[in-house]
Amino acid sequence: AISPQSFLIVNSRGEYIQQNFVSIQEAINEAENGSTVNVPSNTYFERIIVNKTISLVGEDAVTTIIDGGLGGTVVDVVADNVTIVGFTIQNSGWGWDRSGIETQGADNCRIENNILFHTCHNIRLNGSRNCFVAGNKIDHVNQMGYGIRLTESTNCTVSNNFVAQNIGGIVFENSSNCTVVGNNVTRNSDGIRLYSSSSNNRITANIVYNNSYCGMIYPLQYGYPEDNTIFHNSFINNTNPFIIQSGGNIWDDGYPSGGNYWSYYNGTDFFKGPFQNETGRDGIGDTYYAVNYFEADRYPLMNPYGSIRNLDTNLTYLTIQSAIDSSETINGHTLRVGSGVYHENVNVYKSLTLMGENQATTIIDSDEIGTVLSVNADNVSVVGFAIQNSGSLFPTYGDDCGVFINHSTGCKLSDCFVTNNRIGIYLFFSQNNIVERNIVSSNRENGMLLWYSGNNVLRHNEISNNSYNLGVFGGSFSDFNNTIDVGNTVDGKPVQYLIGVENEIFENRTNIGVLYLINCINVTVRNLNLTRNGHGVFCFNVTNSKIENVTALESSYGIYLQDSSGNIVYNNVCLKNWVGICLQDSDYNIVEGNIVGDGEKGISLYEADNNNLEGNTILYSLYGIRLYSSHSNEIFHNNLIENAIQADLIASYSNVWDNGLEGNYWSNGANSDANKDGLGDLPQTIDDYNHDRYPLLSIFKKFRVDYEGRIYNVKIISNSTILSFAYENNSYIIRLTINGPNQTYGFCRICVPHTLMEPEISVLIDDGLTEILYSNYSVYDDGFSRWIYFTYQHSTHEIVIVSEFWPVISLSILIIATFLLAMLRKLK
C-alpha cells in the first residue's frame, strides 16, 4: 500500500475537490459521473474498474504508473464516455482475457497518450462503438500478445499510436467501419491483422515496417474480411509485405491520390495519368502491385506516403514537383522531404525552402534524364539531399546538371551530396548565393561551375573525383568577385582563390589544389602540381607576374590568362587538358618553353595581341596553335608535332611566324635543305596570308647557361636526341651527348652567344674519331651570337664545341691528347 496521495477531482459542475486517497479505485468510487479525476505521479499497484462516466488523467505518463501485479486486466472500462489519458500501464500477466486497458461494451471512450508494456492485450476494444485510441506507446518487449485489438467493435478510430514487439500490432476481429490512421507499427510478428468478417474499415497513412512475419495478414480460417479500403500506407522491409487468402478489398484511393508504398515494389515512374500512359512523372508506379492472386494496388506509391510535406500547410504530396506546383504552396513556405529515392526532375520556381531528412538517404534521382534540380527563383534554400544521375547530353550550357541555379540571387545550397551528374553544381548568371558544406564527387564534367556569377560565397565544400573539379568563368571583375575560402577542397587539397594579392610567391606548395589570382600584381607561381579542374592556374587582371615549372594536367584549361598583361608563362607542362595554355584579352605576355598537348588545343589566343610565343613544344592535339581575332603576335622556335591541325587562324592578322632568321618546327612539313643550314628551303604555308619563312627542319631546344651571374641561352636545332648538355665555365667548352638511329644522318644547328665562346668556333666529335660530314661554322652572326651547322652519321656521340681562339697551348694540348688517344686505340 502507498501513503495517501492528494487527488484533484473536478466534477461536472466545475467544482474542485482536493482529497487524499490511497488508490485510484478509491478516487473513482468517490467521483461523480462527468468528473475528471487527476491522478498524481506515483506507482499504484492495483487493478481498477472504471464504471462511471469520468476522465481519468495521469499527472505524467512516465511517472504515473498503474501496475497490475500480473493479476489480470489492469484498467477495465465498463462505462460509456470514459477517458483514460497519461498513464504507464503494465503487468497484466499472460492470458487471453488479460489486457492493459479494455473497454467492455463501452462506447464513446477515449484512450490517449498512455504507455503500455508487459500486458497481454495492451489495448482492447471489446464490443465498443465510437471509441478513440490515439497517441499511445505500446512496446511489449517480448513479442507476446497484441498491441491494439478491436473485437466486434464499430466506428472506432485508432490514430497515431506507436505499436511494437507484439504478436499482432493492430488486430481487427469481426469489427467494421473503423479507421486506422497514422500509426507506427514495427517489430511485431504481424503488423496489422484482420480476422473474421471485418469489413468496411479504412486503413490509411500507417507506417508498417520491419515486422518479422508480414505487414498485413488475412487468415482464411477466421473468415473473409471484405470491402476494406487500404491506401497511403507504407509497408517497409516486412518479411512478407502481405499475406491474404481472400479478395474484395480496395488497395488504393484512385488516381491521382494513389495506393500504398511497398518497399519490395520494383516498378518505375516515367508515366502519369489514370492509365499511366501519359508522359511525365507523378510519384506513382507505372505498373500495378500484385497484393495477392485476387487483389492489386493499381497505383503503388514510389515513396512512403507523407514523405513530402509542406510544413506551413501540413499538406502532403507524392512528388517534390507536385508540392512545388501546388497552389497552396507559396513563397516563403518550407517543404520537408523524408528519406527515400525520388525519381524526378525538380524545378523550383518559387522562393521556397526544400529540406531533406538526411543527405545520405533523401535522394533525388533523374534517371539520367535532364537536370535533377533547377532553381529558377530568388531566395531558394535547398538543404540535406543527395542529388544524382542527371542526363549526359552536352547541349547549350545549363542542361543536364545536378543542381542548376539559373539567374537567381539570395539562394543557399548546403549539406548535399551531388554525384554522378554531367555537371555537379552550376551557377549560371547568379549572384549573392551561398554554397556550403556540400560533397560534390564523381560528376562527368565539372564538379562545381560558376559561369558569369559573382559575389557568391563558397564554404567548406568537398569537391573530388570529377573530370574538372572547380571552374570559375566570367568576363569582368564582378564575375570573379567571389568569396571562396581554403575550406573548399579539390581532391583533398585546398582551393586558393585570391583577390588583390601583390608581391606574393607560391612555390613548392603541395597543398594547393587549384589557384585563382584575381587583380594581382607581381606574383610568382612556381613548382606546383595541379590536376582536374576548370583551370590549373587562372589569372584575371594579373600583371608583371610569372608562372613557371607548373605541371597542370587533365583540366579544362591548364593555364589561363584573361585581361592580363606583362606576364611570363615559362617552362610549364600542360598535358591532357582541353586547352593547354589560353590567353584571352591578354596582351604583351611571353609564353616560352612550355610543353603542351594531348588535348583539343595546345595554345589558344582569343582576342589577344602582341604576345610572344617562343620555344614551346605543342604536340598531339587537334589544334596545335589556334588564334581567334588575335593580332601582331610573334610565334617562333615552337615545335609543332603531330597535331591534326598544326595552326588555325580565324580573323587574325599581322602575326609573325619567324624572328627573321628562324621559324618553327612543323612535323608535317615536307621540305629540303639544299644550302645545309637546318632550315627548310621553302616557306611553311599556314594559310593564304600567313607563312613561316624559315621553317626548322627538326626540333628546337634551348639550354640555359648561368655564366657570371647572368643567364645565356644556347639554342639547338637537331634531329638527334640530345642526351646531355654541359657548358664548362673555366674552359669555355660546350659538351653534348647525342644519339640517333644507326645508318641515318644527323645534324645540329647551334646558336652560341659570344659571351660564352669567341665567334670562331670548331667542333670535335668523339675526340675527332667521328668524321664531320659537312660543317659551316659561320652560318650567321648578329654581333651577339654565332650560328654554326654540321652533320654526321648517327650513333651515340660526344660532341665538343670550342673556340678557335682558345688559348694556343690549350688547343695544342687538346690536339695532341686527341692524337695520342687515337693511336692508343689503334694499337689495341
Residue ranges and their predicted role:
Residues 24-31, 44-51, 56, 77, ...:
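Short, T/G/N/S-enriched strand-turn elements that build extracellular solenoid repeat scaffolds
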Residues 739-759:
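Surface-exposed beta-strand/loop patches in extracellular or lumenal glycoproteins
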Residues 7-49, 306-343, 347:
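Acidic Gly/Asp/Thr-rich repetitive segments characteristic of extracellular carbohydrate-active
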Residues 1-10, 27, 56, 84, ...:
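Secretory targeting signatures
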Residues 54-97, 315, 351-401, 490-512, ...:
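Right-handed parallel beta-helix/beta-spiral solenoid domain characteristic of secreted/periplasmic
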Residues 67-75, 94-103, 118-126, 140-151, ...:
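Extracellular beta-strand/beta-solenoid scaffold signature
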Residues 34-55, 59-71, 240, 247, ...:
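N-terminal extracellular ligand-recognition/capping segment immediately after the signal peptide
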